[in-house]
From Swiss-Prot:
Part of the 50S ribosomal subunit. It comes from the Bacteria. It comes from Roseiflexus castenholzii (strain DSM 13941 / HLO8). SUPFAM superfamilies: Ribosomal protein L30p/L7e. This is Large ribosomal subunit protein uL30.
Length: 75
């Protein structure tokens, strides 16, 4: 399962209480704090609700084999 790196970029001051609660539920406490969550529909829905306050990056799946050039030349 892939992971999502979520960074809290903009303050929730002036936004509705449920958006502030969503930020807290994601585990974000201070501006520029970063959390990593599994990529699930629940987390995606929370991110969608506060997409104007956070930035999101997909992290590569660590379980998948890495495709490195030159691996076929190793003995």
């Amino acid at each position: 399962m892939s992971k999502l790196k979520i960074t809290y970029r903009k303050s929730a001051i002036g936004y509705s209480h449920d958006q502030k609660a969503t930020i807290r539920s994601l585990g974000l406490r201070r501006l520029n704090s970063v959390v990593v969550h599994d990529d699930t529909p629940t987390i995606r829905g929370m991110i969608f609700k506060v997409r104007h306050l956070v930035s999101v990056e997909e992290l590569p799946d660590r379980d998948a084999p890495a495709d490195h050039p030159g691996d076929d030349m190793k003995r």
